UniProtKB/Swiss-Prot annotation:
It comes from Neurospora crassa (strain ATCC 24698 / 74-OR23-1A / CBS 708.71 / DSM 1257 / FGSC 987). 3-dehydroshikimate dehydratase; part of the qa gene cluster that mediates the catabolism of quinic acid (QA) and as such, allows the use of QA as a sole carbon source. Catalyzes the third reaction in the inducible quinic acid catabolic pathway by converting dehydroshikimate to protocatechuate. The qa cluster encodes 3 inducible enymes (qa-2, qa-3 and qa-4) catalyzing the first three reactions in the catabolism of quinic acid to protocatechuic acid (also known as 3,4-Dihydroxybenzoic acid). Its EC number is 4.2.1.118. This is 3-dehydroshikimate dehydratase. It catalyses: 3-dehydroshikimate = 3,4-dihydroxybenzoate + H2O. It is an enzyme of class 4 (lyase). InterPro entries: IolE/XylAMocC-like (IPR050312), Xyl_isomerase-like_sf (IPR036237), Xyl_isomerase-like_TIM-brl (IPR013022). GO terms for biological process: 3,4-dihydroxybenzoate biosynthetic process; quinate metabolic process. The lineage of its organism: Eukaryota, Fungi, Dikarya, Ascomycota, Pezizomycotina. Induction: Expression is induced in the presence of quinic acid. The quinic acid (qa) gene cluster is subject to two levels of gene control: a primary system which responds to the presence of quinic acid via the qa-1S repressor protein that blocks the qa-1F activator, and a secondary system which represses transcription of qa genes in the presence of a preferred carbon source such as glucose. One of its GO terms (molecular function) is 3-dehydroshikimate dehydratase activity. Keywords: Lyase, Quinate metabolism.
C-alpha cells in the first residue's frame, strides 16, 4: 500500500488566530493532502460557531460537538479528504487522582461517538505530560489504564483503535522504546503506536537548553535507537507516523529566552514554537530526520498515513496567507522526502519552489 499524505488540522493555523477549519481544509485540498488529523480544538471551534454555545467548565456541550463532527465529515468529503484520527485524548494514562481518571474515562464515550461521526477508527493518546506529582511512575498502572480504553474501543461498533505516542517531554513515557514496551504489554489488537520523528529525536538528539542544541553522544544515541526500532517494532502495530523536523535555536532555551516558560519543560516550549517541515534547512532544521524516516519506511517497511504534525509560532499569526503558506511548505517537504527516500505514494507531489515567509 503506498503512503498517503496527511496533516494535523491545527498545523495549518490555530483557530484562536482566526484560521477557520474551512480555510485550512481548502488549503490542504489545494496542495494535495489526502487526509487530516483532526485536532479537538478545531472540532470545538466548529461546534461553537454552529451552535453559538461555548463549553462550560463542568463538561463539553455534547450535542453541539456531535453536530460539528457530522459537519466536519461533510466538509472533508466535499474536498476529497479523510479524517485519519481524532486527537489528542490528553492526560489520561497513569493519573494519581483516580477520581479524575474516572472522569476522563467517562469522556471517552463522547470521543468514540465523535470518531464514528467523523468516519475514523483512530483516537490518538499522547503520553501524559502533567507534573510528576500528578502522574504515577507505576508502569503497571499506566498499562492497566490503557487496557481499559482499548477494551472499551474494541466493544464499540464499529471498533475504535488507539495510537499511543511518547512525547519528548512526557512525564513518564518520553522515549519511543518505553512507549513500545507499553503497547506490547497492553497487548490488544486495537492498541498501537504512533511514531513521530520529532518526538523520537527531540528526546535523544536535541537539547534546546544546550548551546550546541544537542545531547551528549547524540549521534550514537540515534544510531542505537534506529537499530532498536528496526529490530524490535512490529510494523502492523504502527497505526500511522508523523514526520517533521525542528529549528536549532541561536541561544539556549533558558530563563530570558523569548520561548522560555517556567511552567513547562524546555522541550515542550521548543516544540510549540519551533517545529519545522522536513528539509527546511533555510529555517534552521537540524534533526537527522532522514535517518529515522529511512528506518520507518525501509527498515520496518511502514506503509499508510504519514502526517506532518507541525507546531510553530507561525500557526498563531493572523492573516489568510498563513494556511496557504503552511500547506504549501508541508507539501514541498513531502515531495522532498519522497524523492530522498524513494517512497511509493498515493496522490500527486508538489514541485513548485519554496515560499519565502517569516517564522
Amino acid at each position: 500500500m503506498p503512503s498517503k499524505l496527511a496533516i494535523s488540522s491545527m498545523s495549518l493555523g490555530r483557530c484562536f488566530a482566526g484560521h477557520s477549519l474551512d480555510s485550512k481544509l481548502d488549503a490542504a485540498q489545494r496542495y494535495g493532502y489526502l487526509g487530516i488529523e483532526l485536532f479537538y480544538e478545531d472540532l470545538v471551534d466548529v461546534a461553537e460557531h454552529l451552535s453559538n454555545e461555548r463549553p462550560s467548565p463542568e463538561g463539553p456541550f455534547v450535542e453541539a460537538q456531535i453536530a460539528a463532527a457530522r459537519h466536519i465529515l461533510q466538509m472533508c468529503q466535499a474536498r476529497g479528504l479523510e479524517v485519519v484520527c481524532l486527537q489528542p485524548f490528553m492526560h489520561y494514562d497513569g493519573l494519581n487522582d483516580r477520581a479524575e481518571h474516572e472522569r476522563r474515562l467517562e469522556k471517552l464515550a463522547l470521543w468514540i461517538e465523535l470518531a464514528h461521526e467523523l468516519h475514523t477508527d483512530i483516537i490518538q493518546i499522547p503520553a501524559n505530560f502533567l507534573p510528576a506529582n500528578q502522574v504515577s511512575d507505576n508502569l503497571d498502572l499506566i498499562v492497566s489504564d490503557l487496557c481499559k480504553v482499548a477494551d472499551i474501543g474494541a466493544q464499540a461498533l464499529p471498533p475504535i483503535r488507539f495510537a499511543y505516542e511518547s512525547l519528548c517531554w512526557s512525564t513518564r513515557v518520553d522515549l519511543w522504546e518505553r512507549c513500545w514496551d507499553i503497547v506490547q504489554r497492553v497487548d490488544r489488537p486495537n492498541f498501537g503506536i504512533c511514531l513521530d520523528t520529532f518526538n523520537i529525536l527531540g528526546r535523544i538528539y536535541a537539547d534546546p537548553t544546550s548551546p550546541s542544541g544537542r545531547t551528549p553522544n547524540a549521534k550514537e544515541a540515534v544510531r542505537k535507537s534506529i537499530a532498536n526500532l528496526v529490530s524490535r517494532v512490529d510494523v502492523s502495530k504502527v497505526f500511522y507516523v508523523q514526520v517533521v523536523d525542528a529549528e536549532r535555536l541561536s541561544k539556549p532555551l533558558l530563563p530570558g529566552h523569548p520561548y522560555y516558560n517556567p511552567e513547562q519543560p524546555a522541550r515542550m516550549s521548543w516544540s510549540r514554537n519551533c517545529r519545522l517541515f522536513y528539509g527546511e534547512t533555510e529555517y534552521g532544521a537540524y534533526l537527522p530526520v532522514k535517518e529515522v524516516a529511512r528506518a520507518l519506511f525501509h527498515g520496518i517497511g511502514f506503509e499508510g498515513w504519514v502526517s506532518l504534525e507541525l507546531f510553530n509560532r507561525r500557526m498563531s499569526e493572523e492573516g489568510p496567507e498563513v494556511p496557504e503558506e503552511l500547506a504549501m511548505r508541508g507539501a514541498i517537504s513531502w515531495a522532498k522526502l519522497v524523492q530522498d527516500l524513494r517512497i511509493p505514494v498515493e496522490g500527486p507531489l508538489v514541485t513548485m519552489p519554496r515560499v519565502s515567509a517569516s517564522l
